[in-house]
Structure formats: structure tokens, C-alpha cells
Amino acid sequence: MEPRTVAEAVETGKEDVIMEALRSYNQEHSQSFTFDDAQQEDRKRLAELLVSVLEQGLPPSHRVTWLQSVRILSRDHNCLDPFTSRQSLQALACYADISVSEGSVPESPDMDVVLESLKCLCNLVLSSPVAQMLAAEARLVVKLTERVGLYRERSFPHDVQFFDLRLLFLLTALRTDVRQQLFQELKGVRLLTDTLELTLGVTPEGNPPKLLPSQETERAMEILKVLFNITLDSIKGEVDEEDAALYRHLGTLLRHCVMIATAGDRTEEFHGHAVNLLGNLPLKCLDVLFTLEPHGDSVEFMGVNMDVIRALLIFLEKRLHQTHRLKESVAPVLSVLTECARMHRPARKFLKAQVLPPLRDVRTRPEVGEMLRNKLVRLMTHLDTDVKRVAAEFLFVLCSESVPRFIKYTGYGNAAGLLAARGLMAGGRPEGQYSEDEDTDTDEYKEAKASINPVTGRVEEKPPNPMEGMTEEQKEHEAMKLVTMFDKLSRNRVIQPMGMSPRGHLTSLQDAMCETMEQQLSSDPDSDPD
């Protein structure tokens, strides 16, 4: 049915005609997410008619059908204006049972009406900055969190819980003030941690399920996303003992999340949200990842259960198969693994054994191949700065931040970026709490070590001498051509001669020479003023 026909039916004021037209329109467009521009004005007209009745109040028997029509029209970005007034948003909040206005909430709300209203609010908040502002001003987050807190005591339909959490996610993703309000005033981390525990089915008496059902998976992912939003900018520096205990409890739930599967094909997506949130936890709270007692089926290393680390490595390998949005895909899990390796010696040694096993193939460049080491070394020269930084940082920590060892596994050419950023181009080792790990060399590596090109990280075939057969005059001529080419590139600022500062940083050759001269003058007693 065309929107013009529906609008004309609404204008008749006849209840049976209106409801028949709306039901027909809803059925026809239930899966419509794109709209014909030619009917745009008709849809706007219909939206205005629906809103006028919505704000005045709907008869209980008509609410679901009416709200379904509002939901369909709220998908059209060109029809949002009628729905984004303060009055219409307040009406939707009342029907969703999340209005903070006194006396505006029915005692026993119809859950079908609540659900349709939540869907309308989600559409509006997603697409309209005005709706986002009005929702924040109306403090919808307060009533939403109150209802979320009742999930343990009362039974709510899955869809209502899901869209409660989806609306919380949208508000916290799009409004900084709502994030802060949920984190501080409403104690959102504790509330949502308890809700996550309930959703996962974790109880002190028994083991949680190893396979999370589809509905619980959907709700758990929304909870993880909201927790990520409110902890992203809020957890800075040290936390007190009470907060540390809360974050450790959340960490144990996330540990469980990365080790279970979900119904359907959403396991990797679920793990991704858990890993993202792990990266927001205070570093000292990541120790809960290693508190599981070893058992018969677990991966044990140096007396520590490494099941979580193995699960994170498997997740990393899956993400490395992706070719797009690598920053979002691999940076979070690499950051978590890096911090685990930095703070926990058994974890670092286990990861090094898995990622950087003793070198045997010394004739292949480190970035060539399908081993995990090869894939990570390739990322060290990725176009995205954040991707190459986290990949290099991870491998550097696995090498106990030893420059020679880092170059050995990656090649100087691949390692140069991190070494330059760290001021380690001249070698050395930064300050860090690392024990002197043994780095056992294989017989193959020992035999070929003297022939390995440190820049490429492999044994190179000796190239032919390009000057073989040349006279001295020809050699001098070629050398002068090379000098002229470099001079031209330098004058045109295509390249810039670089030198090494005393602190190991790359700097322009001119600055390096000036610094050297200044040091010589300052150390020369004859240069002191009279």
C-alpha cells in the first residue's frame, strides 16, 4: 500500500479504515530499509499524522500497530524530523516504560508495546543527532538501567532485554555525557557485570555452559559493547582495591567468554567483543587470565594453565586471515597478548615458543611464509601505523625487548620502524623487568649465522660484482654519476641524509654534525671565554 493511501485513510478519522490501512502498510514494508524518493513527501505527511496522534495518546488496542508504522518510517532518514520533537520522544519513552516523568508509566506495561517503542527509539537515536540530544536530556539511561537491574528478579522477554541493551549501547556510543553518567552516577560497570554473569549462566555452584545459546549470545554481545563504551575513557591510572576486585571479577567472566563457543556462527564475533573489553581493563587486573588451575585437558606450561592464551592465539590467527579493517581486527588482541607477555614471564615464554620458535629456515625472508611469525612480521610494514606498531611491539616484547634478538627474528629492515621510534637504532635494551631468557640457537642457525644479511634476516646469495671487468676510469665515472644522482635527490628534498644522535635517534645529517661540533667545542678547554 502506498504511503499516500495510508495518509488519506488516517485523515478520514475512521478507526476501522485507519487500522486496516496501517496493518496492510506494515505487512508490506516490514522488511523495507530503502525507500523510493518519489514518495518522500507522502511519507513525511504520513509521519506527521502518526506523530500527532502518538503525542495525544493511543488506545491500548491500537498501540502495537501504530508503533510498527512509526518504526518503519523511522528507518527513512528523510522522515525523521516529525519524530524528533521533545513531545514525540517523550511519548515513545512512556510507551517503552523508560520515561522519568512522574505518573507517566503504566503499572503493568504491555511488553509488545514496550518492544515496538524501543525499536523506534533505537532507529531515531541511531540516525538523528537531535534524538540523541533529547534522549540524553530526558535521562532515558536512568530508567533503562533500572530495568536492566531487574533482570535477575523478574522475567522479561528476550527481545525487550536485547533492545534495552541495544538502546544503551547506542546512547553510550554516541553521547559522551551518557557514558560518564552510566559509569559514575549509575555504577554501570557493576550493574552490567552482574547482568553479564546472569546472561552467561555463571553460578558459584556449577560450571557454566560450554555452548552459549543464540539469544544469550546476542544479549551478552550488547552488554560487552556497552561495557566497552563506558570503560574506554574512564579507567585511567591506578584503581582502588574495591574497583580492582570488580574489574578482576569482570576479567574472570571475559576469560570464560574467550574460551566458549556460541550457537550458530557468531563465536568469532563474540570473542572479538570480549577481547576488545579485555583491552580496557586495568593492566594489573589481567592476572586473572592465569588463575585457572591446570587440569587433564588444559595446556600447561611452567605449571600455569595457558588455555586462555591458547584461545587468544587461535583468535589472532583467525583475524589475521582477514584482509580489511585490520586495525579493528588484530590490534586489540595483539595489545592484550603484549601486556600478558610483558607482565607474566610464563606467558611470554609460552607465546615465544608458539610465535617465535627456534630458527631453522635461514634462507627465507622473515615476512615470507604462512607461519604466525611470518604474518606478524608482514604487519610490521603495514600502511596503518597502529597495526604495524602493535605487531612490532608484540614481537619485541616476546624477544624480551632485546634489540639483537628482535633483529634476528624479524630482520633489521622490518625492525627499523620500532627501533627508530624507541631510540634503539644503535642497539641496546630499554629498561624493563625481564629475566635473562636463554635464546637457544638451532644448528642450522649457528652454521649460517655469519652469512645472514641482518637487513633482510636471511642468507643471501652472493651477488655478482657489478664492477667486474671495469677499468679504474670507468669505475670513477660510475661513482661520480652516483654522487650526482644523490646530490640531485637531496637538493630536491626527495631524500634527506640522516645520521644517528648520541641517544640512538635518527636525525638529519646536518643536525648531527652541528651537535657533534657543539660537543667538541664544549669539551675543548681552549674554547672557554676569557
From Swiss-Prot:
It holds the Pfam family Ric8. It comes from the Eukaryota. The modification Phosphoserine is found at residues 435, 501, 522-523, 527. InterPro entries: ARM-like, ARM-type_fold, Chaperone_Ric-8_A/B, Gua_nucleotide_exch_fac_Ric8. Gene3D superfamilies: Leucine-rich Repeat Variant (1.25.10.10). The modification Phosphothreonine is found at residues 440, 442. Phosphorylated at Ser-435 and Thr-440 by CK2, stabilizing its interface with G alpha proteins. It is found in: Cytoplasm, Cell cortex; Cytoplasm. PANTHER family: SYNEMBRYN, SYNEMBRYN-A. Belongs to the synembryn family. Chaperone that specifically binds and folds nascent G alpha proteins prior to G protein heterotrimer formation, promoting their stability and activity: folds GNAI1, GNAO1, GNA13 and GNAQ. Does not fold G(s) G-alpha proteins GNAS nor GNAL. Also acts as a guanine nucleotide exchange factor (GEF) for G alpha proteins by stimulating exchange of bound GDP for free GTP. This is Chaperone Ric-8A.
